[in-house]
Design a protein with these regions (language model features):
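Intrinsically disordered, low-complexity Ser/Thr/Pro/Gly-rich regulatory segments
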Residues: 1-216
């Protein structure tokens, strides 16, 4: 079983496709995989200001690399004349553009961390249409079949993830995973637990103020 962040699916998750994939990744990927669901970040560049980013899934293997996955459920359609995507009758955002943009934004977010490894690390993006079967053809010039997860791929999702990593790596033998040091940074950036407690001095001052208020009453 893969290690999941969060370890239980957020009850607020509305997408049935994401719910289904969460369980499949958890149960069918080996334990050396780490999968982050519904990852959000805020990225800022001095010349551009700040903007939000969110990825449906980030799939990471310490030796293979990092994959950003955008999920769209239901029947999928693309209208070339208007460049509009649809899920059933509903217009949706371009999933390829979302995945590509989120990949680059997440790369930049991680590289801003002082402990992110200074070596070639494989980043890639992919799109999931888990409710339909795509067939063997590439869907668009920027959406080859190799980076599309469809219903037929769910039977062996580990094989599909391996295929995507191989597609992005190509002949770049030096490209690899983040390693144990990079995995630690990923958890620190995307899934860090923390708590804030009042300083003792603040607590004492509040107690003293309360005594004054009670005395005045």
């Amino acid at each position: 079983m893969a290690r999941m962040f969060p370890e239980r699916l957020d009850p607020s998750t509305e997408s049935s496709a994401e719910k289904r994939l969460y369980a499949i990744f958890r149960d069918r990927l080996p334990q050396d995989f780490v999968v982050f669901h519904s990852v959000r970040w805020l990225l800022r560049e001095p010349s551009q200001g700040a903007w939000n980013g969110e990825a449906d899934f980030v799939i990471v293997h310490p030796e293979r690399g990092l994959l950003v996955l955008e999920v769209k459920g239901g029947p999928i359609r693309y209208e070339a004349r208007t460049r509009q995507w649809f899920s059933g009758p509903h217009p949706i955002r371009d999933p390829v553009g979302q995945a590509r943009r989120n990949q680059h934004d997440l790369m930049e977010k991680l590289r801003q961390h002082p402990r992110w490894p200074d070596r070639p690390i494989l980043f890639g993006h992919a799109v999931a249409f888990p409710d339909v079967e795509v067939g063997p053809r590439d869907l668009l010039p920027d959406l080859p079949r190799a980076i599309v997860l469809d219903r037929s791929d769910l039977r062996d999702v580990e094989r599909w993830v391996s295929r995507v990593f191989s597609y992005w790596k190509g002949e770049h033998a030096s490209m690899g995973g983040p390693g144990s040091d990079g995995m630690a940074v990923l958890r620190d950036v995307l899934a860090r637990s923390w708590s804030l407690r009042p300083l003792l001095r603040s607590a004492v001052e509040e107690a003293e103020q309360r005594i004054v208020e009670l005395t005045e009453e």
